[in-house]
């Protein structure tokens, strides 16, 4: 009797948790519909507490049209490689101010940044720029270039200005990312900014409010790695909205790069491009996609028109997302912010707020 009671209580608790929204969260990025009957959906899967859900297979998804399940054998549903329709960029900004270059810790920084590039470069196009007290960034290696070789060259570089233009570097980095995304070769484009610093902004070429406005308008994810005696977590967390590693021990630089690389890697793997062949042959239809994983489930839905659909569909066909109106998905904590304090778009790429460095 006690076992039955415990089971009923457990089931009741599970139902309450599900009702409270503790299942998986699926967020639609874009979808494609093309003849003969191809439907493709690009979306993310996360837990209720915003943890990425990776490694789902086609069998972990159930597709419904007009609330009726579509046979997996009939739909031939599959997960396509995201590279056919999407590209992800990561820009790493490395603090090369006097306090970093003269610290004696450059070999550790170079090793940590190189391993970061190796790991993140598996999933994204990575570029590296450096900053010091100067008004503008200095390119170390462009997107998709030899990251390890470029970072190694930092060993022989000296700052043009020993101060730290951290705020200005973030704003200019957002501009660089936005420009790269605007000229991407595929319709779905995403950007991540990662900043390493050993302290705080000293140049005062731009204010913290300038940085906040630029981040609000960028639709770009941002992370910060801070390792040094002058590190202030509260200041850095305003920049690293998706994640901040802060330590006043310079020896923690490897730990910081590893932690942020792991978070970006996991975030990259939360994206899925699910493709299937629709059995519908005419009219408007509602599609629901249910994902099951991490001991829970969740759904997303949208509508499509099947006019002119027919046989001979191959689900491996490249989707036809809108090239002329590319989409990016703002980071959750920007998109969820009240309208009066956020301006992150769900379509296109807004440029960061206008800013001119104080020279």
Label each residue range with its predicted role.
Residues 35-39, 249-343, 357-358:
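C-terminal "exit" segments of structured domains
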Residues 26-91, 96-105:
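Acidic, polar low-complexity linker/tail segments
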Residues 20-21:
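C-terminal motif of bacterial Sec signal peptides marking the signal peptidase cleavage site
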Residues 57, 76-89, 98-126, 141-146, ...:
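…and closely analogous acidic/polar surface helices at protein-protein or active-site interfaces
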Residues 196-241, 245-248, 257-260:
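VWA/integrin I-like adhesion module and closely mimicked acidic/polar interface patches used
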Residues 114, 136-139, 149-191, 202, ...:
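Von Willebrand factor
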Residues 61, 95-97, 109, 128-131, ...:
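DG-centered beta-turn motif at the end of beta-strands
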Residues 2-11:
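Bacterial N-terminal signal peptides that target proteins for export
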């Amino acid at each position: 009797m006690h076992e039955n009671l415990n089971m009923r209580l457990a089931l009741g608790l599970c139902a309450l948790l599900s009702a409270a929204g503790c299942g998986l969260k699926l967020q639609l990025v874009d979808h494609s519909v093309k003849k003969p009957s191809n439907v493709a959906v690009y979306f993310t899967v996360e837990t209720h507490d915003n943890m990425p859900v990776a490694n789902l297979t086609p069998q972990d998804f159930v597709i419904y049209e007009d609330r009726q399940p579509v046979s997996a054998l009939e739909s031939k549903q599959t997960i396509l490689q995201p590279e056919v329709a999407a590209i992800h960029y990561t820009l790493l900004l490395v603090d090369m101010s006097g306090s970093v270059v003269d610290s004696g810790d450059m070999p550790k920084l170079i090793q940590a940044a190189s391993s970061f590039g190796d790991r993140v470069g598996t999933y994204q196009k990575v570029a590296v720029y450096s900053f010091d007290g100067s008004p503008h960034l200095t390119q170390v290696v462009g997107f998709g270039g030899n990251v390890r070789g470029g970072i190694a060259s930092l060993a022989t570089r000296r700052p043009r200005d020993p101060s730290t233009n951290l705020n200005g570097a973030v704003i200019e980095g957002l501009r660089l990312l936005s420009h790269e995304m605007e000229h991407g070769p595929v319709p779905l484009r995403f950007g991540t900014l990662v900043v390493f610093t050993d302290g705080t902004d000293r140049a005062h070429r731009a204010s913290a409010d300038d940085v906040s406005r630029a981040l609000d308008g960028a639709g770009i994810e941002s992370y910060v790695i801070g390792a040094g005696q002058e590190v202030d977590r509260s200041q850095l967390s305003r920049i690293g909205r998706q994640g901040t590693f802060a330590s006043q021990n310079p020896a923690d630089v490897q730990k910081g790069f590893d932690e942020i690389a792991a978070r970006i890697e996991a975030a990259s793997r939360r994206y899925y491009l699910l493709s299937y062949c629709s059995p519908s042959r005419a009219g408007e239809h509602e599609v629901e996609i249910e994902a099951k994983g991490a001991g829970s489930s969740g759904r997303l839905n949208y509508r499509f028109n099947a006019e002119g659909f027919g046989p001979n569909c191959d689900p491996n066909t490249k989707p036809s997302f809108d090239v002329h109106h590319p989409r990016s998905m703002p980071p959750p904590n920007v998109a969820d912010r009240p309208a009066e304090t956020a301006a992150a778009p769900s379509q296109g790429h807004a440029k960061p707020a206008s800013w001119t460095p104080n020279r």
